[in-house]
Amino acid sequence: MARVEAPQDALGRLIEALRVLPGVGPKSAQRMAFYLLQHDRNGAAVLAQSLGEAVDTVGHCARCNTFSETQICSTCADGRRDPSLLCIVETPADQVMVEQTLSFKGNYFVLMGRISPLDGMGPNEIHFDRLLTRIENPDTGVPIREVVLATNFTSEGEATAHYIGEVLKAKGIKVTRIARGIPVGGELEYVDAGTLARALMDRR
């Protein structure tokens, strides 16, 4: 098989770089690049600067693992939240969706993925050791009384919830799962706030 050469010109490199975005193929990347250069060069410059700044400054919260520019994110630092209640989600986008329901007042842990052996994602890749440390040795000084599993209702999300749930239950930790108001195969990021709020309230 012939080796595919990387594009050498700036436009080709831009098109290739845009393809790292989910769902963006060669034609979509080309349209984006052409639009930015033809219609919005100032916007392209702002985009490039903002992306560079985010890559340099955005890390992970030391407590919940979500994206944060500070060691402890604003959610974890909020003293009004219930530190004895921990909600586990797959991604920062899922955390945002749960927050928008206004029905959860505890803290979070963001796995940054889900168990999927075919994709090379196991317990280590979803920061399971950090999660256990977070639960068994909470730095808030308040024991965690309930862990809410809010992974997606995909096969990988269910496998992740099952794995985490079994380990935590064996340690005597109360574990609940959000209710199935969310369709099988559904992802939290695309569920309306009302449905998600009901799923949280009906957890068991």
UniProtKB/Swiss-Prot annotation:
Any single biological process term in GO: DNA repair
HAMAP family, sorted: RecR
Gene3D superfamilies: 3.40.1360.10, 6.10.250.240, RecR Domain 1 (1.10.8.420)
Gene label: recR
NCBIfam families named among the record's database cross-references: recR (TIGR00615)
Top-rank taxon: Bacteria
Record CDD domains: TOPRIM_recR
InterPro entries documented for this protein: DNA_Rcmb_RecR, Rcmb_RecR, Rcmb_RecR_Znf, TOPRIM_dom, TOPRIM_RecR
Identification of the protein by name: Recombination protein RecR
ZnF locations on chain (C4-type): 61-76
